[in-house]
C-alpha cells in the first residue's frame, strides 16, 4: 500500500514539475516577444491569452485525449494514458496562465528599460536574459502559481 501511494505522489509531482518548467520555458520568450513587438492584433492576442487562463481542466484533458488517441494527430506516438499525455494536458492548462502573468508584469517593467536596451543596442536574447535576471523572484512566483494550477 505504501509503495503505491508513494508511486502516485512521485508521478504527480514529476508530471506537474516538468509541465510547469516546460510552460515557463515556452512562455517567457513568447511573452517578451509579444510585449516588445508592436503589431496590429496585439491587444486581441493578449485578450485571447487572458481568456484561455480560465480553460477548465476537463476541456484541456479532452483536447489532449483527442490529440493523442489513435485517430488523433499525435496517435502515432502511442502515449495515451501515460505521464507524457498528462504533461501535455497540464501544459495546455498552465501555459496561458504563465503567459498572461508574465505579459502583465513585462508591460509594467519593459517601458522602464526600453530606452536603455535601445541605447546599448541589445539583441533579443540579451533582453531576455536581462529581464529574467532583473526580476527572477517575480518569475519564480509566477512559476509557483503555474505549479499550483497543475
Where are each of the predicted segments found?
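Short charge-dense sequence patches
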Residues: 1-2, 13-17, 117-126
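Short helix-to-coil transition segments within interhelical loops
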Residues: 109-136
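Membrane-water interface segments at the C-terminal ends of transmembrane alpha-helices
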Residues: 2-107, 131-150
Amino acid at each position: 500500500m505504501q509503495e503505491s501511494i508513494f508511486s502516485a505522489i512521485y508521478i504527480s509531482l514529476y508530471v506537474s514539475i516538468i509541465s510547469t518548467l516546460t510552460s515557463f520555458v515556452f512562455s517567457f520568450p513568447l511573452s517578451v516577444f509579444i510585449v516588445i513587438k508592436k503589431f496590429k492584433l496585439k491587444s486581441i492576442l493578449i485578450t485571447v491569452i487572458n481568456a484561455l487562463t480560465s480553460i477548465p481542466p476537463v476541456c484541456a484533458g479532452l483536447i489532449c485525449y483527442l490529440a493523442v488517441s489513435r485517430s488523433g494527430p499525435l496517435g502515432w506516438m502511442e502515449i495515451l494514458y501515460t505521464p507524457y499525455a498528462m504533461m501535455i494536458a497540464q501544459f495546455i492548462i498552465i501555459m496561458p496562465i504563465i503567459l498572461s502573468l508574465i505579459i502583465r508584469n513585462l508591460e509594467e517593467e519593459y517601458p522602464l528599460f526600453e530606452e536603455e536596451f535601445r541605447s546599448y543596442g541589445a539583441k533579443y536574447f540579451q533582453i531576455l536574459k536581462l529581464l529574467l535576471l532583473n526580476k527572477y523572484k517575480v518569475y519564480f512566483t509566477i512559476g509557483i502559481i503555474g505549479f499550483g494550477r497543475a
